[in-house]
Amino acid sequence: LGDVYKRQLVFHGQDPGEMLRLGIRFGKALQLINILRDIPSDLNIGRCYIPSVRLASLDMKVSDLKSEESMEKFRPLYNEYLDLACEYLDCAGDYISLIPRQHRRLRISCMLPVIIGWRTIRLMRRQNVLDQDKDVKIDRKQVVSILLKTRVASRFSNYESRLMRSERDLAQ
C-alpha cells in the first residue's frame, strides 16, 4: 500500500525515504489489526501469528488461545500489540498528512482504512477476541458513515485533523 502511493507522491516533492518508512508502518498497522482480530479463525486452520516466546512469558501456549477463558491472562500482551498497532496507525496519519491536499481521493483512500482500523481497535479493547462466536468488526453502517466523513474531511484540513485525532483518541 505505502510503496504504491509513495511512488506517486515522489513526483510531488515528498521525501521518498520518509514516505516509504511511513508507508511500511501504515501497511504493518493494517496487517497487525487483521492478525489480532482473526486469532480464533487462524487457530482453526492451524496458524498462530502470536510468537510462542511472547505467550510463554505469560505462562501460556498457543493452544490456550483456543479458550475464551484465557483472555484475561492474554489481555496484557494483547493490549501491547494493540498499542503497537496504534503507533503504526499514527505513522499512517503522518503519511496521509504528506499527501498533497489536491489529491482528495488518495487522501480518502488512506483515511478510510485508518479510521476503520482505529474503530476496530476500539472494539478489540472491549471484546473477548478469543470468543469464536463473536466477530470483531464494525458494521456496514459505520463504514458508510466513515466514508461520508472522510469525503468531507478531505476538503477541510481542520475537520480532517479533528476527525483523525478523535478517532485515534477513542482507540487508546
Kindly give the residue locations of the regions a language model identified.
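Catalytic cores of Mg2+-dependent Asp-rich isoprenoid enzymes
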Residues: 6-29, 36, 40-172
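Short, small-residue-biased leader/transition segments that mark boundaries at the very start
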Residues: 1-5
